[in-house]
Amino acid sequence: VENVHRLQDPQDKVMAGFVMAGAAPHHAKGIQTLGSINYQPLWCFYRSPVPLPIKERETLILSHNVNMGTTNSGTHLLMQEMLKLNGITGDLSKFKQYPDEQAIEMLRDGRLDSVCIVDTYESPNVQKLLKIPGLQLSEFERAEAYARMVPAIEMVTIPEGALDLPTNRPSTSSPM
Protein backbone atom coordinates (compact mmCIF):
# COMPACT_ATOMS: atom_id res chain seq x y z
CA VAL A 1 0.00 0.00 0.00
CA GLU A 2 2.91 2.32 0.76
CA ASN A 3 4.15 1.89 -2.83
CA VAL A 4 0.74 2.96 -4.18
CA HIS A 5 0.94 6.21 -2.21
CA ARG A 6 4.51 6.81 -3.32
CA LEU A 7 3.64 6.19 -6.98
CA GLN A 8 0.74 8.65 -6.76
CA ASP A 9 2.77 11.34 -5.00
CA PRO A 10 4.11 13.79 -7.62
CA GLN A 11 6.83 14.90 -5.17
CA ASP A 12 8.19 11.35 -4.80
CA LYS A 13 10.94 10.32 -7.22
CA VAL A 14 9.72 6.70 -7.37
CA MET A 15 8.65 5.79 -10.92
CA ALA A 16 7.93 2.05 -10.54
CA GLY A 17 7.15 -0.31 -7.71
CA PHE A 18 5.84 -3.70 -6.74
CA VAL A 19 2.26 -3.64 -5.49
CA MET A 20 0.08 -6.51 -4.35
CA ALA A 21 -2.98 -7.01 -6.54
CA GLY A 22 -5.91 -5.23 -4.93
CA ALA A 23 -3.76 -2.86 -2.88
CA ALA A 24 -4.69 0.02 -5.18
CA PRO A 25 -8.21 1.06 -6.11
CA HIS A 26 -9.34 -0.52 -9.40
CA HIS A 27 -8.50 2.60 -11.40
CA ALA A 28 -5.76 4.21 -9.31
CA LYS A 29 -4.91 7.55 -10.88
CA GLY A 30 -1.50 7.56 -12.53
CA ILE A 31 -0.74 3.87 -11.99
CA GLN A 32 -0.53 1.28 -14.75
CA THR A 33 -0.02 -2.44 -14.12
CA LEU A 34 2.59 -4.32 -16.09
CA GLY A 35 1.36 -7.75 -15.03
CA SER A 36 1.61 -10.29 -12.24
CA ILE A 37 4.80 -11.87 -10.99
CA ASN A 38 3.42 -14.65 -8.78
CA TYR A 39 0.44 -15.78 -6.78
CA GLN A 40 0.14 -14.77 -3.15
CA PRO A 41 -2.84 -16.69 -1.80
CA LEU A 42 -4.74 -15.77 1.33
CA TRP A 43 -3.72 -18.40 3.86
CA CYS A 44 -5.90 -18.76 6.96
CA PHE A 45 -4.63 -21.12 9.64
CA TYR A 46 -6.76 -21.99 12.67
CA ARG A 47 -6.19 -23.93 15.89
CA SER A 48 -7.86 -27.34 15.78
CA PRO A 49 -6.63 -30.93 16.09
CA VAL A 50 -8.60 -31.89 12.95
CA PRO A 51 -9.97 -30.01 9.91
CA LEU A 52 -13.42 -28.58 10.64
CA PRO A 53 -16.48 -28.56 8.36
CA ILE A 54 -17.16 -25.18 6.72
CA LYS A 55 -19.83 -23.95 9.16
CA GLU A 56 -17.81 -24.84 12.28
CA ARG A 57 -14.68 -23.34 10.70
CA GLU A 58 -16.49 -20.09 9.83
CA THR A 59 -17.91 -19.86 13.36
CA LEU A 60 -14.48 -20.44 14.88
CA ILE A 61 -12.78 -17.91 12.62
CA LEU A 62 -15.49 -15.24 12.93
CA SER A 63 -16.08 -15.51 16.68
CA HIS A 64 -12.55 -15.87 18.03
CA ASN A 65 -9.31 -13.90 18.02
CA VAL A 66 -8.19 -13.66 14.40
CA ASN A 67 -5.23 -11.71 13.07
CA MET A 68 -5.89 -9.94 9.78
CA GLY A 69 -2.59 -8.10 9.38
CA THR A 70 -1.56 -4.57 10.17
CA THR A 71 -3.59 -1.62 8.93
CA ASN A 72 -2.76 -0.84 5.30
CA SER A 73 -1.18 -4.27 4.72
CA GLY A 74 -2.37 -6.28 1.73
CA THR A 75 -3.75 -8.95 4.06
CA HIS A 76 -5.77 -6.39 6.02
CA LEU A 77 -7.22 -4.82 2.87
CA LEU A 78 -8.16 -8.20 1.40
CA MET A 79 -9.71 -9.40 4.67
CA GLN A 80 -11.78 -6.20 4.93
CA GLU A 81 -13.06 -6.78 1.39
CA MET A 82 -13.92 -10.42 2.08
CA LEU A 83 -15.68 -9.58 5.34
CA LYS A 84 -17.69 -6.89 3.56
CA LEU A 85 -18.66 -9.36 0.80
CA ASN A 86 -19.96 -11.68 3.53
CA GLY A 87 -22.01 -8.91 5.15
CA ILE A 88 -19.71 -8.65 8.16
CA THR A 89 -19.34 -5.05 9.25
CA GLY A 90 -19.73 -3.26 12.56
CA ASP A 91 -17.77 -4.56 15.56
CA LEU A 92 -14.60 -6.18 14.31
CA SER A 93 -12.85 -6.19 17.70
CA LYS A 94 -12.12 -9.93 17.45
CA PHE A 95 -9.99 -9.17 14.41
CA LYS A 96 -6.48 -8.24 15.50
CA GLN A 97 -3.89 -6.19 13.61
CA TYR A 98 -0.50 -7.58 14.58
CA PRO A 99 2.53 -7.83 12.28
CA ASP A 100 2.77 -11.31 10.73
CA GLU A 101 5.79 -12.50 12.72
CA GLN A 102 4.22 -11.46 16.04
CA ALA A 103 0.88 -13.03 15.08
CA ILE A 104 2.55 -16.34 14.22
CA GLU A 105 4.20 -16.46 17.66
CA MET A 106 0.90 -15.55 19.33
CA LEU A 107 -0.88 -18.32 17.41
CA ARG A 108 1.87 -20.80 18.39
CA ASP A 109 1.49 -19.74 22.06
CA GLY A 110 -2.33 -19.95 22.02
CA ARG A 111 -2.93 -16.19 22.33
CA LEU A 112 -4.60 -16.12 18.89
CA ASP A 113 -7.04 -18.64 17.41
CA SER A 114 -6.42 -17.92 13.75
CA VAL A 115 -3.99 -16.07 11.50
CA CYS A 116 -4.69 -14.92 7.96
CA ILE A 117 -1.77 -13.90 5.78
CA VAL A 118 -1.27 -13.07 2.11
CA ASP A 119 2.07 -14.48 0.99
CA THR A 120 3.75 -17.02 -1.26
CA TYR A 121 4.06 -20.69 -0.34
CA GLU A 122 7.84 -20.28 -0.17
CA SER A 123 7.73 -17.37 2.30
CA PRO A 124 9.29 -17.94 5.73
CA ASN A 125 5.99 -17.00 7.42
CA VAL A 126 3.91 -19.58 5.54
CA GLN A 127 6.61 -22.20 6.10
CA LYS A 128 6.57 -21.48 9.87
CA LEU A 129 2.78 -21.80 9.96
CA LEU A 130 2.86 -25.11 8.09
CA LYS A 131 5.19 -26.56 10.74
CA ILE A 132 3.19 -25.60 13.84
CA PRO A 133 1.44 -28.69 15.27
CA GLY A 134 -2.31 -28.42 15.85
CA LEU A 135 -2.98 -25.92 13.06
CA GLN A 136 -5.30 -26.48 10.14
CA LEU A 137 -5.29 -24.67 6.81
CA SER A 138 -8.69 -23.26 5.95
CA GLU A 139 -10.08 -23.99 2.52
CA PHE A 140 -12.11 -21.36 0.70
CA GLU A 141 -14.97 -23.35 -0.79
CA ARG A 142 -16.28 -20.14 -2.36
CA ALA A 143 -12.91 -19.05 -3.79
CA GLU A 144 -14.30 -18.94 -7.31
CA ALA A 145 -17.12 -16.63 -6.19
CA TYR A 146 -14.63 -14.27 -4.51
CA ALA A 147 -12.51 -14.27 -7.67
CA ARG A 148 -15.52 -13.24 -9.75
CA MET A 149 -16.49 -10.43 -7.38
CA VAL A 150 -13.03 -8.98 -6.74
CA PRO A 151 -10.88 -8.50 -9.87
CA ALA A 152 -7.62 -8.66 -7.86
CA ILE A 153 -8.40 -12.16 -6.55
CA GLU A 154 -7.39 -15.21 -8.55
CA MET A 155 -8.38 -18.66 -7.37
CA VAL A 156 -5.60 -21.20 -6.89
CA THR A 157 -5.92 -24.82 -5.82
CA ILE A 158 -3.52 -26.57 -3.49
CA PRO A 159 -3.51 -30.22 -4.70
CA GLU A 160 -4.02 -33.04 -2.21
CA GLY A 161 -0.71 -33.78 -0.46
CA ALA A 162 1.10 -30.83 -2.05
CA LEU A 163 2.10 -29.21 1.26
CA ASP A 164 3.30 -32.43 2.90
CA LEU A 165 3.15 -35.79 1.10
CA PRO A 166 3.98 -38.04 4.10
CA THR A 167 1.03 -36.65 6.10
CA ASN A 168 -1.11 -36.04 2.97
CA ARG A 169 -1.60 -32.36 3.79
CA PRO A 170 -4.03 -31.10 2.66
CA SER A 171 -6.11 -34.30 2.67
CA THR A 172 -8.16 -33.03 -0.29
CA SER A 173 -7.48 -30.49 -3.02
CA SER A 174 -8.05 -27.10 -1.41
CA PRO A 175 -9.33 -24.03 -3.25
CA MET A 176 -7.80 -20.78 -2.08
Q: Which residue stretches match the model-derived regions?
A:
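Solvent-exposed coil/turn segments that connect beta secondary-structure elements
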Residues: 10, 21-24, 37-39, 47-50, ...
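Bilobed "Venus flytrap"/periplasmic-binding protein-like clamshell domains
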Residues: 1, 40-109
